[in-house]
Amino acid sequence: MSAVSAEAVTPGAVRSGSDSRPRSGGDGAAPLAPRAKLLPALAAVYRAQLSRARVARIPLLFVATFQSVGIMIMMRGVVDGGDEARAVVAGSSVLVVAFVALNLLAQYFGQLRASGGLDHYATLPVPPAAVVLGAAAAYASFTVPGTAVTAVVGSALFGLPMAHLWVLAAVVPLSGAALAGLGAALGLLAPRQELATLCGQLGMSAALLLGVLPAAHMPAPIAYARDLLPSTYGVEALARSFDARPDWAVVAADLGVCAAVGVVSLAVATWAYRRAAVR
């Protein structure tokens, strides 16, 4: 039995095999990469989503636009002009946004959650808000050409003035933010992928029925339900722009409601993403 002097056993002289790797600091933990800032991370997610959906973009735009143009052609035999024509054209144009931003984004996040794809995003050093906002912005941007084509075709079909169609530059992003946030929240909160798809389809159907049909002909309970739908205020803002002298204060108020709903819905979607990613 050999004796070892106390001086020979110094702190750190005895190391286990599992602790023999080089240490980068005093606590032995390797430093992690710093979390990316919100705006650069958002831009990266946005570009990645655009690249991922590039192949499906043309068919997607065709389906969404063809659907809205077909609805306007069908309604042309029923509606002659006036407020009803404005409602049909504005509702059909915003329907393109609802088809993509609400319906398809709900399906995308529902599929991502069901397949475990959220685990991939959870490993990236990006803020949860960047994932949600980047995907929402990418899906909403898909709708710009289709919405513009639908508005121009509808204006020509019903003889509406096109002088103020520039308001689409505000209607599309604001209503897109509100509907995309709602779609992302539905997809992330739905317990099953099938329910996420169903919620997206029901939301798009509500945007169709409550947006295209003139509000004056709706029963009171349906009119109240219409007021709760975020796309309604984008439809109202666009419909008012077809007037000879639009009331821009009311248009701005409608767009302000879209913006407020967009902030709330995207915040809920970000919370839902955090909740789903840690499960």
Language model regions located:
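Aromatic- and glycine-rich beta-strand/loop motifs that create alpha-glucan
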Residues: 2-17, 21-66, 279
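Junction motif at the cytosolic side of a transmembrane helix
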Residues: 2-25, 75-78, 156, 243-245, ...
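Short hydrophobic, aromatic-rich alpha-helical segments embedded in or entering the lipid bilayer
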Residues: 37-45, 215-253
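Hydrophobic alpha-helical transmembrane segments of multi-pass membrane transport/permease proteins
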Residues: 55-81, 86-101, 202-208, 260
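Hydrophobic/aromatic residues in alpha-helical transmembrane segments
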Residues: 70-75, 98-105, 149, 181-182, ...
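Transmembrane helix segments
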Residues: 76-79, 190-232
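Hydrophobic alpha-helical transmembrane segments of multi-pass membrane transport proteins
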Residues: 85-157
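Alpha-helical transmembrane segments and their short interhelical loops
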Residues: 128-129, 133-200, 248-259, 264-266
